[in-house]
């Protein structure tokens, strides 16, 4: 439900704004600020008035902010939707990635890959999808590799355990 509402706000914002990239970057910064527990608590608190919440966000973006951005924040405040800023930022980022045909993905593994190996993997994914994909590495206790690009709906998993199981099944079937 939240994503549907955020999508409508993001569509409206991108239709009236000339520079969607700068607005998306401001919303990304606001999203990080909202992820701080104290700020999130203030935004979702029924005790704090909607005007104070709006003023808090407006003071965070500063006086030199774009008029479109200021009006957008005021509309979100009037409709008590300031807590949707992270979701709106996510939708705008996804739209910008789709527009530029560049996506971000996550590579999860127990050990870090070298820059050359990572570049090869990115090149392979680019050939497969036709889109430029930039992978960020995350270290996990997973034995193997997991590559996911959420905006494209891609998830590839290579685990030692799964390969072992498939090899055993293949040997059993061949006997």
From Swiss-Prot:
Q: Could you tell me where this protein is found in the cell?
A: Cell inner membrane
One GO cellular component term noted in the UniProt record for this chain: plasma membrane
- Return one GO MF term: proton-transporting ATP synthase activity, rotational mechanism
Coiled coil, from the record: none
Gene3D superfamilies documented for this protein: N-terminal domain of the delta subunit of the F1F0-ATP synthase
Q: What is its main location?
A: membrane
Q: How does it sit in the membrane?
A: Peripheral membrane protein
Record SUPFAM superfamilies: N-terminal domain of the delta subunit of the F1F0-ATP synthase
Judging by the UniProt lineage, the source's domain of life is Bacteria
Keywords attached to this Swiss-Prot or TrEMBL record, sorted alphabetically, are:
ATP synthesis, Cell inner membrane, Cell membrane, CF(1), Hydrogen ion transport, Ion transport, Membrane, Transport
Instruction: Tell me the function of this protein.
Output: F(1)F(0) ATP synthase produces ATP from ADP in the presence of a proton or sodium gradient. F-type ATPases consist of two structural domains, F(1) containing the extramembraneous catalytic core and F(0) containing the membrane proton channel, linked together by a central stalk and a peripheral stalk. During catalysis, ATP synthesis in the catalytic domain of F(1) is coupled via a rotary mechanism of the central stalk subunits to proton translocation.
Q: Which family does it belong to?
A: Belongs to the ATPase delta chain family.
What's the protein name? Answer: ATP synthase subunit delta
The gene that this protein is the product of is: atpH
């Amino acid at each position: 439900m939240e994503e549907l509402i955020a999508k409508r706000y993001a569509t409206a914002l991108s239709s009236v704004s000339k520079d969607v990239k700068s607005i998306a970057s401001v919303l990304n910064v606001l999203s990080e600020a909202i992820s701080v527990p104290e700020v999130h608590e203030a935004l979702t608190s029924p005790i704090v008035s909607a005007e104070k919440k709006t003023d808090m966000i407006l003071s965070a973006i500063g006086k030199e902010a774009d008029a479109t951005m200021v009006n957008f924040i005021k509309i979100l405040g009037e409709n008590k939707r300031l807590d949707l800023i992270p979701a709106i930022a996510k939708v705008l980022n996804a739209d910008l990635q789709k527009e530029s045909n560049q996506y971000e993905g996550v590579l999860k593994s127990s050990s870090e890959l070298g820059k050359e190996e990572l570049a090869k993997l990115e090149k392979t994914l680019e050939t497969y999808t036709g889109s430029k994909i930039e992978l960020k590495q995350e270290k996990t206790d997973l034995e193997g590799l997991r590559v996911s690009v959420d905006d494209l709906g891609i998830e590839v998993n290579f685990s030692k355990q799964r390969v072992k199981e498939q090899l055993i099944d293949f040997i059993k079937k061949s006997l």
